[in-house]
A protein has these predicted regions:
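Bacterial N-terminal signal peptides that target proteins for export
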Residues: 1-7, 60, 110
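Classical Sec-dependent N-terminal signal peptides that target proteins to the secretory pathway
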Residues: 2-20
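Outer-membrane beta-barrel initiation region
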Residues: 19-87, 259-283
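Flexible, glycine-rich linker and terminal segments associated
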Residues: 21-36, 144-177, 183-188, 200-283
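Feature captures outer-membrane beta-barrel proteins of Gram-negative bacteria and organelles
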Residues: 29-31, 53-66, 88-102, 123-140, ...
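Transmembrane beta-strand segments that form the barrel wall of outer-membrane beta-barrel proteins
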Residues: 39-47, 69-81, 105-116, 125, ...
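Solvent-exposed loop/turn segments connecting transmembrane beta-strands
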Residues: 46-55, 78-90, 115-123, 154-156, ...
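Short acidic, gly/pro-rich beta-turn/loop elements at beta-sheet edges
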Residues: 67-69, 85, 104, 119-121, ...
Length: 283
């Protein structure tokens, strides 16, 4: 609970500061200069109870427009801790998104390749659907044949995850989500779990994800985590500074602005270590 209390206090300070918008906008402008081209760019800090912080940069860029949507690419680079050792992970993906005839909903498909500095390689296929209030994502992950992690005693695990998010009534700037995952163990039992949390848009360029990761696996601790994200361009709509709305749900809106948002997936590769009673973090 101390972790949650500290995170909430920090969030309150960030959004109550009279300079919050200016500070987050300056950070957003710096982020936009990190990766060339128009599109979505994000950098984040991932804070966890039982592990050192992770840092990442992610970008989404449009490849081509279509009559009903677009083709896009998403790529990211970040550090993470596995088996008490830091490593770097890169992701590269391509996808297609389609708008409904009235443009109030969006669906999409995507494919990714993930690679880390221990020569572990993985591919994934995903689908997504969203409107102004609800969002659904499903991803399947599988080790690539040319993954060399086995040579250093590591095994990439196949698996899947499902995520359903909904706007919180009267809080147009916050979503509640449930994210279930399953990883197929090789020399040990499978790993399953559920994340329960919330996404809160603190300012137009700053978001906080706060969740509890309930892991159904002995040897892997349940934990709270907080992910602070800075992004560019600024998002339209309500932020935490607007408080409680008079209306319960967001009105239906044109989803064209969502065509270059990031794909919700597990960018970190799930690893099983040989000769270790623990598997690893589940993200």
């Amino acid at each position: 609970m101390r972790f949650i209390t500290k995170t909430l206090i920090l969030s309150f300070i960030l959004i109550s500061n009279s300079y919050a918008d200016g500070i987050s906008e300056k950070i957003g402008n710096l982020i936009s200069e990190m990766v060339p081209g128009e599109g979505y760019t994000e950098t984040s800090i991932d804070l966890r109870e039982n592990n050192s912080p992770d840092f990442s940069i992610l970008a989404v860029r449009e490849i081509a427009k279509t009559d009903d949507g677009n083709f896009f690419t998403q790529f990211s680079l970040f550090n993470t801790e596995k088996n008490s050792s830091d490593r770097w992970v890169g992701n590269l993906g391509f996808g297609k998104r389609m708008l409904s005839d009235d443009k109030t909903s969006m669906t999409g498909i995507n494919a990714f390749i993930d690679y880390d500095t221990k020569s572990n390689a993985r591919a994934s296929l995903g689908v997504e659907a969203k409107n102004a209030v609800l969002e659904f994502n499903a991803n399947y992950y599988e080790e690539l044949p040319n993954s060399f992690g086995n040579e250093v005693g590591e095994k990439v695990l196949d698996g899947y995850d499902l995520r359903l998010a909904s706007q919180i009534p009267y809080l147009h700037w916050a979503n509640a989500f449930v994210n279930s995952y399953h990883w197929d163990g090789v020399d040990r039992d499978d790993v399953e779990g559920i994340k329960l949390g919330t996404d809160m848009l603190l300012t137009s360029t700053m978001n906080l994800e706060l969740a509890f990761d309930d892991k159904d696996k002995e040897g892997i601790e349940d934990e709270w985590y907080a992910k602070l994200q800075f992004f560019y361009p600024p998002r339209e709509g309500a932020t935490a500074q607007d408080g409680i709305s008079d209306t319960k749900w967001k009105e239906e809106k044109d989803m064209t602005g969502q065509l270059l948002t990031k794909v919700k997936r597990q960018n970190k590769i799930m690893i099983e270590f040989k000769g270790n009673s623990k598997i690893t973090r589940t993200d």
